[in-house]
Swiss-Prot record:
Family: Belongs to the complex I 23 kDa subunit family.
Protein name from the UniProt record: NADH-quinone oxidoreductase subunit I
Function (record text): NDH-1 shuttles electrons from NADH, via FMN and iron-sulfur (Fe-S) centers, to quinones in the respiratory chain. The immediate electron acceptor for the enzyme in this species is believed to be ubiquinone. Couples the redox reaction to proton translocation (for every two electrons transferred, four hydrogen ions are translocated across the cytoplasmic membrane), and thus conserves the redox energy in a proton gradient.
Highest taxon, organism lineage: Bacteria
SUPFAM superfamilies reported in the protein's UniProt record: 4Fe-4S ferredoxins
HAMAP family: NDH1_NuoI
Keyword Transcription tagged: no
Record key words, sorted: 4Fe-4S, Cell membrane, Iron, Iron-sulfur, Membrane, Metal-binding, NAD, Quinone, Repeat, Translocase, Ubiquinone
Organism listed in the record: Wolbachia sp. subsp. Brugia malayi (strain TRS)
Protein's gene: nuoI
Chief location category: membrane
GO cellular component, one term: plasma membrane
Amino acid sequence: MLKKLAWYWSFVELIKGFIITLRYAFKPKVTLKYPMEKGPLSPRFRGEHALRRYSNGEERCIACKLCEVICPAQAIVIEAEEREDGSRRTTRYDIDMTKCIYCGLCQEACPVDAIVEGPNFEFATETREELMYNKEKLLRNGEIWEEAIALRLKKDVSYH
């Protein structure tokens, strides 16, 4: 009797599994064939960091160091000096991407939208040294992604 009950239960469970399989076989697929297909990104997606420039080519960063102070991972290091006109500009702006937790606090703290997290999430490297971003690398990212970053910032709603 117990053997017959176990066989019956196994058969019923097998049929249930087939029914579930058939149900999902004819539904639209939810997976993407990455990297050929890419899904949509939220305007607030936080990817690779970039430093932006004004349209006249001047760096936006005013060396207020708010991003360095607010970074919970202490991944940002900034050194600055005063210029002849009295304004401050960075001489060193480094981000250790191995420490960064992509929280976006640096972007939120920046009063001039100088540091942003762009739409690029495909930046795999072979060595840890390549994940140490200096000012030149960050400015280059800003130049490459400026159009996409500006569009995303326009779509985004301010918290303030």
